[in-house]
Amino acid sequence: MSNIIDIKAQESVTALEDISVQGEKDRQEWSQKAEVLCEALPYMRKFAGETFVIKFGGSAMGGSKSLKNFAKNVVLLKQVGINPVIVHGGGPQIGSMLDKLNMKSSFIDGLRVTDSDTVNVVEMVLAGSINKMIVSEINAASGKAVGICGKDGGLIKAKKLSRTKKDPDSNIEKILNLGFVGEPYMVDPEILGIFEDSDIIPVIAPIGLGDNGETFNINADTVAGAIAAAVNASKLIILSDVDGVMLPNGELVSYLNIVTARKMIKDGVISGGMIPKVETCIEALESEVGYAHILNGSVDNILLMEIFTESGAGTMIL
């Protein structure tokens, strides 16, 4: 009998020890959460009432997990008093749809040549499929999102993008024909102002309207920068599939000013697809946007880490 009592007593002691250990883990976890909240609170107060334009790239969407996490982050921003305006891309998704339709697609200097048939597919994928997918995820995360494109209400007036390239044989600058690839020349901020004073989060597809009713395919980074300037946003945030501006040794550049950013482009430190992103940020800053950020949108809670922590998580240009 005494052996049974000893065993039961030992089991009780073990159970109490387990509870004690679990209790300590819970206390540590809650303490960490409290520290995070204390660090975030000053930033929440600082940015309440401010407008952030967030570009969510097609390459940053990854799988449904990345999109769901993005939606939750955006809803939280709205709930703490920040006004997020979402602009999305969709390059990989457009390419996939064109392949399914057996439509050939070519690029010149990183820009998709967009003929009349291609622009219809671009509009269908951007303003239809992707836009509504993002809207649905934000709504599922207890937010209120409305999807629009630049043609709606004349939000984005666009013109044909003019690009030239030097012919290697004749050394003459020749005009490139990119079809219905456009650039915004006017953004109507009044349309977005309607959403600012409500619970609604606007989700914008980068399609523009020409003066003659044409539909233009516009680079999403460019659209985000133009909208940020038009609404006097305090932040332009570009979410892509890279961590930010990187040095040749692989080190992340956490902070950049405009002068240094331009020098890094000139010296070739910033190259490839990062150049137009940084140039968009510079143009936005020169148009009185407060700060610009480039982040890896595939990282969970990247928006919250960048906005609400002192260390940040990507590259901030100021």
Q: Could you tell me what each predicted segment is?
A:
Residues 1-298, 305, 309-311:
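Nucleotide/pyrophosphate-binding catalytic subdomain
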Residues 313-318:
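Long, charged amphipathic helices and adjacent flexible linkers at domain junctions
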